[in-house]
Amino acid sequence: LVYITVPIALAVCLSSYITYRTHSAAMRHVIEKDIKATSFFVAENINLTISDIKNSFRVAAKSETIKESLENTGQREHERVVAFFEAIKHVMPTITDVFLLDETGNIRARLNSHDYGNNYGDRTYFRQAIAGETAIVGPLVSRVTPKECVYIAVPVGNERHKGVLVASVELDSISVLCFNHDITSSRIDIFLLDNTAHILMAKESTKDSKHPDSIKLDDHTLSDGTPQGYVTYAFNGKTYTGFYKKIKNLNWYVLIAMDDTQNNKTELSSTKNSILLTLLEILIGRLMGSIII
């Protein structure tokens, strides 16, 4: 009996170990693919929203209402352009504010406030747009609210009357695109980072240990412009595995990460099921053999 039982026990142990190693590697591959797919999804969501605003503003820049507001400073023109801004906001609710600047950076009209005291001639997005380029800049702190915004600016007018049409989008609005959809799991952390790995926004799976203001990525830098890649980093005694994806048109990155204890739990759960199935198959085989004998 010993000569029969011991080899069987060894075979079961060896089979279980091989199963564990195989399933661990397979599950890690699945988890990494899921993290990568989620980062692509979130990054593309943000990119499409910003691109839609940019393209819509290029069309809006050709509006006669905008041109008339640059050429005339009357109350009638002002009311018409503000009504035009309200229509834009209705179509694109992600936008926080819309305003029109003249060629010196002064406010001609604004959706949320008159704000005639401020001059925006020193802003990067104004300088780029007044030179004829479409600009996407941010995050910058708004001069109207204390919140950080992304700014999309397009040139408007003609050689005689130049101006810049600007849309601002608060980070809070972008966070909806990052965090409020079904693909996000309660087990993963989602970060919006700048190119120094400074955290702009975060959705963390646990509330007991918040990440610091920036993430130290092991042997990796985002400032070199690499568009995507797997990374590891350590925080609060845990090691995290993640995938980052650069957002088009913005110098930002989406990072989807999961701490390795969560990875191991997922792998172990799947492996346990596989081992139990292997043991069950062996026991059934032995039982059938006994019956036949």
Regions found by a protein language model. Give the residues of each.
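Extracytoplasmic/periplasmic ligand-binding sensor regions of membrane-associated signaling proteins
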Residues: K89-H181, T232-F235
